[in-house]
């Protein structure tokens, strides 16, 4: 019951009009077919009257034929008009839909513009840029600190490599025995003796101190 009292939309009205126009078009086509049938019958009658020499009958039938052909011509004009109306209705419907879409879009844009504050948006972008710069600076400081730490570790490893190389040059192996070695003050010769040639006895004494047989 509710659908009976529902207000028709524009689409509903246009659909009804199109149905009526299609019905009118079919009726015009049927009328034209009937007129063409009558036209052929009149032509046959005129030929028949002409064969028997009945001029008066031929004249009357000829007038009817002229009137019928005029009526048939009118059906073509009316049919073209109906087709034009149907096309125009479709165009109007399309234009109304586009206008409705534009109206909806305009309302949406208006609502968005009301919600959006240009000053607030600009401030948000500036804050983002500021915080991003802070983050980049913090990251750079952390990277510099880590580089310093690891660079120091590399220096320590490099120093240890130099010590190992020097000990290796004088024929001392330190694999697992450096902890048992005497301190540098006792194991290393003085500045005056370091300049002299190290004797075999000195080397043997250092090896025994390191626990090397």
From Swiss-Prot:
Membrane topology of the entry: Peripheral membrane protein
GO terms under cellular component: cytosol; ESCRT III complex; late endosome membrane; multivesicular body
Phosphoserine modifications at: 199
Compartment(s) of residence: Cytoplasm, Cytosol; Late endosome membrane
Organism per entry: Bos taurus (Bovine)
Region (Disordered): 178-202
Role, per record: Probable core component of the endosomal sorting required for transport complex III (ESCRT-III) which is involved in multivesicular bodies (MVBs) formation and sorting of endosomal cargo proteins into MVBs. MVBs contain intraluminal vesicles (ILVs) that are generated by invagination and scission from the limiting membrane of the endosome and mostly are delivered to lysosomes enabling degradation of membrane proteins, such as stimulated growth factor receptors, lysosomal enzymes and lipids. The MVB pathway appears to require the sequential function of ESCRT-O, -I,-II and -III complexes.
Keywords carried by this UniProt record: Acetylation, Coiled coil, Cytoplasm, Endosome, Membrane, Phosphoprotein, Protein transport, Transport
Organism superkingdom: Eukaryota
Protein name per Swiss-Prot or TrEMBL: Charged multivesicular body protein 2b
Biased composition (Low complexity): 179-194
Motif (MIT-interacting motif): 201-211
Transmembrane segments: none
Complexes and interactors: Probable core component of the endosomal sorting required for transport complex III (ESCRT-III). ESCRT-III components are thought to multimerize to form a flat lattice on the perimeter membrane of the endosome. Several assembly forms of ESCRT-III may exist that interact and act sequentially. Interacts with CHMP2A. Interacts with VPS4A. Interacts with VPS4B; the interaction is direct.
GO biological processes: endosome transport via multivesicular body sorting pathway; late endosome to vacuole transport; protein transport
Matches recorded under InterPro entries: Snf7_fam
Record-listed N-acetylalanine modification sites: 2
Record family assignment: Belongs to the SNF7 family.
């Amino acid at each position: 019951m509710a659908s009976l009292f529902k207000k028709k939309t524009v689409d509903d009205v246009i659909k009804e009009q199109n149905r009526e126009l299609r019905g009118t078009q079919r009726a015009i086509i049927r009328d034209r077919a009937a007129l063409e049938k009558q036209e052929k019958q009149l032509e046959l009658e005129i030929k028949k009257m002409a064969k028997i020499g009945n001029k008066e009958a031929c004249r009357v039938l000829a007038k009817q034929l002229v009137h019928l052909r005029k009526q048939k011509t009118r059906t073509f004009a009316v049919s073209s008009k109906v087709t034009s109306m149907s096309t125009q209705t479709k165009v109007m419907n399309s234009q109304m839909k586009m206008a409705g879409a534009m109206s909806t879009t305009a309302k949406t844009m208006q609502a968005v513009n009301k919600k959006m504050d240009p000053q607030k948006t600009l401030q948000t972008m500036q804050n983002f840029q500021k915080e991003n710069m802070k983050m980049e600076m913090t990251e750079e400081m952390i990277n510099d600190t880590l580089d310093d730490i690891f660079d120091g570790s590399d220096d320590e490893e490099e120093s240890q490599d130099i010590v190992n190389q020097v000990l290796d040059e004088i024929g001392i192996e330190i694999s697992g025995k450096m902890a048992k070695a005497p301190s540098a003050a006792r194991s290393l010769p003085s500045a005056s003796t370091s300049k002299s040639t190290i004797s075999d006895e000195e080397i043997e004494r250092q090896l025994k101190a390191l626990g090397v047989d």
